Amino acid sequence: MHVIKRDGRQERVMFDKITSRIQKLCYGLNMDFVDPAQITMKVIQGLYSGVTTVELDTLAAETAATLTTKHPDYAILAARIAVSNLHKEAKKVFSDVMEDLYNYINPHNGKHSPMVAKSTLDIVLANKDRLNSAIIYDRDFSYNYFGFKTLERSYLLKINGKVAERPQHMLMRVSVGIHKEDIDAAIETYNLLSERWFTHASPTLFNAGTNRPQLSSCFLLSMKDDSIEGIYDTLKQCALISKSAGGIGVAVSCIRATGSYIAGTNGNSNGLVPMLRVYNNTARYVDQGGNKRPGAFAIYLEPWHLDIFEFLDLKKNTGKEEQRARDLFFALWIPDLFMKRVETNQDWSLMCPNECPGLDEVWGEEFEKLYASYEKQGRVRKVVKAQQLWYAIIESQTETGTPYMLYKDSCNRKSNQQNLGTIKCSSLCTEIVEYTSKDEVAVCNLASLALNMYVTSEHTYDFKKLAEVTKVVVRNLNKIIDINYYPVPEACLSNKRHRPIGIGVQGLADAFILMRYPFESAEAQLLNKQIFETIYYGALEASCDLAKEQGPYETYEGSPVSKGILQYDMWNVTPTDLWDWKLLKEKIAKYGIRNSLLIAPMPTASTAQILGNNESIEPYTSNIYTRRVLSGEFQIVNPHLLKDLTERGLWHEEMKNQIIACNGSIQSIPEIPDDLKQLYKTVWEISQKTVLKMAAERGAFIDQSQSLNIHIAEPNYGKLTSMHFYGWKQGLKTGMYYLRTRPAANPIQFTLNKEKLKDKEKVSKEEEEKERNTAAMVCSLENRDECLMCGS
């Protein structure tokens, strides 16, 4: 059997040669556990004559990855094999790689199709010695196997299907793409990115330094007008943004309801559903640049709209196709008045915005006055019990995990953009809360701080370093506003006037574990607050420094910050004594700030996978999960737990099987000591009341909002109602992003006879269940405290 080498020569397969290649990459690993010969044995079994050395390395890396559950060092080895494989394939020198990317000729049409911008290449070539020598290729070896594979699959630029960039090249391309001729700043950013202190968002990593640097993640729109022109102009904007791979939030509360009169045609409106089906098909058609994921639109509606019940059915799995729009995402923009009426079991009036205009343009007391005046004038189209609509909301969430829940009055009352007008919606991921109008499409550029990195070897938390890195991130995101490619002019106008940015986090759960704090402990709750105080403080200080150089953002005057009111003031919260807020407020009073909004913990799915961190602000969902690779799928264990169990001599095949049998929980495994059981509780074992409380405590330092998922293993209407009311009363802006549930571990098997139940019996069962659910919902509203105690 022979292999084909990289230069095309053939060579006989030699067991020892494969083993020695693997052995070379085992430096610093625990050789009591890691066995290169065992990997070689498995690799040989998968070989065929004529295999290339590239394929051989890929197989060796996958094989090492599958052995990760034996010892965590196998994961490091797997990544080293994969990275060294790429290093042999891709050129080393950064400036050479950038020239190759610029000189790319498209094989389909023979035309010059540069993959990086001429301006980027010129800067690289003019500073090539400094940039080339600043790169430290060993840092490529710090990715874990799955982080590296994610980069290779989606982030590193390819020439004719072959990866051309090394991870360090990509990070330097991004740094130069953002900072242009400011080489000192580019190298500072490169070092922080490559040492994993923070990461820019995926669109920034994909597109920085290219011909079309669309670096923003989020776009928010409100309907231009309740007319055919307005609806289709907005649709075109959505299509153009989606083509550039932006996630979209759209406010549709101003669109007239079903049956409303249309003066221009003397006809009647078909309402929201047919319009949203058109938006649904656009989302499917415009799939973020031709070969990526489908377009993603979140549709925001206020619950007084007459079409609200149909809106709640749009994502359901059953029902008539023409009444569904399953590719869209749905969110409620909820005024406090609705929550109050649900709580006190009052009536709720449904209206058409054409007959009752302006409800989406006001909030708080003004909204309540206008709404009550329309009720008095009898302009109402339908009256229902507020709890009947609440039941439909809970029913939809239990079935589909959505609609998202955002509280309109909190979003406006606690916004630094409230001087611009009423905010009408959030983003696709519920963390961006920005003003939109017919002339302005709100935009946000994102980055996330890797919170695990600031835990020192002495188990203390380095707040000073966190503040320093936050300041660099602010400067970067502020620069992106000016160099960004905007898919529509309204986005450019909005972003340059208000200059909002969104700094989020990843690895909060990892930071708690490294500090040895269980997620629900008092220590974790204090650290949670202090982390977000630090990020908010650092961000405000950096934005103030920028304002000192460049002046405050255009619409600063009249904003809460311009009056000395910061986010925590709007929550009536006093910060801890970690930072000198008095000094900062004096500085801001003198110079202002450059950015209207700063903090927005977003979901960090892809970038957290790259850096090997747990997502965002979330607890771990499981201590074991499955990963798929070409050669099959295998289990990965929470690396912190694996390390702890290995150190205590508790890690063996039987333990792995027990964790798998317990669906990733360790609570019922007798050999595991209590301190580890506390530390490694999964989200299903953590009180969601604590999760909501911690969200509110950090919320006082979050001037946008946060993507907050609620996890209830087996939701019932009572538990869910309790959760929502607790979150609302805590003052959250986003009460819920997704409702995450767990499929029953042993689904009940229906026998044929049971399926043949008479329809009558089935109907009575459904009615019984509805009564039970309603009772649970009402019970939780009437006995809030007791119900929360019995809820998760």
From Swiss-Prot:
Annotated residues for binding of GDP: 202, 217, 431, 604-607
A GO term for molecular function: ribonucleoside-diphosphate reductase activity, thioredoxin disulfide as acceptor
Residue numbers of Phosphothreonine PTMs: 751
Residues bearing the modification N6-acetyllysine: 17, 376
Reactions accelerated catalytically: a 2'-deoxyribonucleoside 5'-diphosphate + [thioredoxin]-disulfide + H2O = a ribonucleoside 5'-diphosphate + [thioredoxin]-dithiol
Site feature (Important for electron transfer) residues: 737-738
Site (Important for hydrogen atom transfer): 218, 444
Keywords: Acetylation, Allosteric enzyme, ATP-binding, Cytoplasm, Deoxyribonucleotide synthesis, Disulfide bond, Nucleotide-binding, Oxidoreductase, Phosphoprotein
InterPro entries, A to Z: ATP-cone_dom (IPR005144), NrdE_NrdA_C (IPR013346), RNR_lg_C (IPR000788), RNR_lsu_N (IPR013509), RNR_R1-su_N (IPR008926), Rrm1 (IPR039718)
Site positions for Interacts with thioredoxin/glutaredoxin: 787, 790
Entry's Gene Ontology cellular component terms: ribonucleoside-diphosphate reductase complex
Additional record remark: Two distinct regulatory sites have been defined: the specificity site, which controls substrate specificity, and the activity site which regulates overall catalytic activity. A substrate-binding catalytic site, located on M1, is formed only in the presence of the second subunit M2.
Protein name listed in UniProt: Ribonucleoside-diphosphate reductase large subunit
Species lineage: Eukaryota, Metazoa, Chordata, Craniata, Vertebrata
Gene designation per UniProt: RRM1
